Structures are given as C-alpha cells and as structure tokens.
Amino acid sequence: MKTISLRFLMTLGLMTLFVVSPFAQKDTGKIRIIMFGAHPDDCDERSGGTAALFARMVYAVKFVSVTNGDAGHQSMKGKELAKRRYAETQESAKRLGISYDVLDNHDGLLMPTLEVRLEIIKKIREWNADVVLAPRPNDYHPDHRYTGVLVQDAAYMVAVPDIEPEVPALRKNPVFLYYEDHFQRPNPFRPDVVVDITPVYDKKIACLDAHVSQMYEWLPWIGGYYEEVPKGKEERIQWLTARTSRPINAQTMASLEKWYGKERASKVKEVECFEVCEYGAQPSDTEIKRLFPMLGQ
C-alpha cells in the first residue's frame, strides 16, 4: 500500500478537528447508522426522513458529506461558502438530533483516491456502523458517482485489520445500501427497502430548510426556477414541502406493501427508498426488519 506522508496525516488530523459535528451521540447499544453524501445537503435530501425516524428511536445516526460544498453557489465560493455550508449542516443536525461531519475535499473535484477511501473507512469504523448508506455510482454528478465508488471500495476493507490499522477494523461487515435515484443505465434502482416517512415529513423539510444556500439559492438558480422562490419564511416552507414531495410508483408501492401490508401502505404519503448493495453483509428480510425497526410500525 502506498505510504502516506506525515504531512498528510497531520493535515487530516487538523481537518478532523474542524469537521466533526458537536452534536455527537452517546453509544446506546442500539443500531448505528452512517449515511454518506457528496455534498452538505445530499444526505438530508435522500434520507432525512429515515434519519429522523432512527433519531426518534434514540439510534445513533451520522451524516457525512464527502466534500465541503465550496463550489455549490452562483455568487459565493471557496472558504466563505464552505464555512456557510458547514454551519447549515450543524443546524440540520440540531433539527434532526443527529451528528453531521463534513470532509475537507473540494466540491466538484472529488476523485476516488486512496486517501479519500481511507477517510471513508475510518468514518465507518469509528462509528462502528451496522448500516451504511450512500449514492449509487451512476449519477449525473461526478461527486455523487465517486462518493458511491468510494463507499463501495470501503465496503470490504472496513473489516481488514492491516488497512488503516490505527483505527480498529470492524468485526462485522455492515449492510450497505444505496439511496434512490431515477437513472436507468446500466441498471435501474431497485426499492428493496421502503420506509414510510409520513409521520416525520415535517422533520425532513425542516432539515432541508436549514440548507438555505441550496434550497432557496443555488438549486433554484442552476435549475432555472429561482424566480419561484418565495421571500417569506412560512411561504418558503410550504413551497419546499410541495417541491420535495414525490409520487409513489407501482414498484415502490409493491415493496411498501411487503413491509407494511396493503392497508397501511394505502395510507402512506411520503417514502424514502433504499437498495441493498451487493457488497457488504447480505441481509435476510428478518435482518432488514431488525436494522429498520420502523418497517411495519
């Protein structure tokens, strides 16, 4: 394995002091979940509702942004933007009751290097994760794709003692899952696990609302709908709620009925979906219910 320089290790140590969320959670002995996103709002968008449900059960949940988001704005940039977006992650963490870390990799320039892979391995080990969520490695944004690749590359290595030996290897392999996306090639997303987030949908909207630079500025600007964004706080929440809501398609409904039963599934309004990754532990339905105890409740 390539030798890592002392300078790199010192830099990584200093960086970690800056990016670790102050909203750390105690180890309760319950399921531990870590969710990776490329940018400091991605986890919120893909799994904010599921995180809220886990947090409500006092499970240990951590979001990790693999980049610092320093390119995601039409007028701000660099350190100023990264600082603002970090503050937004901490507000989101406070609203959800979770931990939120941000790695100091540049937005838009992420590559699946050994150094970043080791960062991912360390995060998973340090959290002693039972469940790991990440994007699929087929996506329009290179940072999303490479975040998926990096987590895939870590899936086996988290249990190998000689890799990153200063952090003890896991004695179990976590279950790795992908967030939902709409991309069809090389293969479409498969909703193996569908979580009813209707009871906590307001929590998801609240955590998204914390990312003001993204929800009300950058994404509307780059998406061509900036003029639609309301000015008032309450109007913005209503607008964001409407924009975030998605219809439940037939494939998702079939999986929802599997986990909740037809009667309950028919009443569900909002969901988040996940696909089991072929890497990592391969869970049975019984194990999925243990890891996602909100299923069927």
Language-model regions, residue ranges each:
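Flexible, active-site-proximal loop/turn residues at the rims of small-molecule/cofactor binding pockets
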Residues: 49, 138, 182, 280
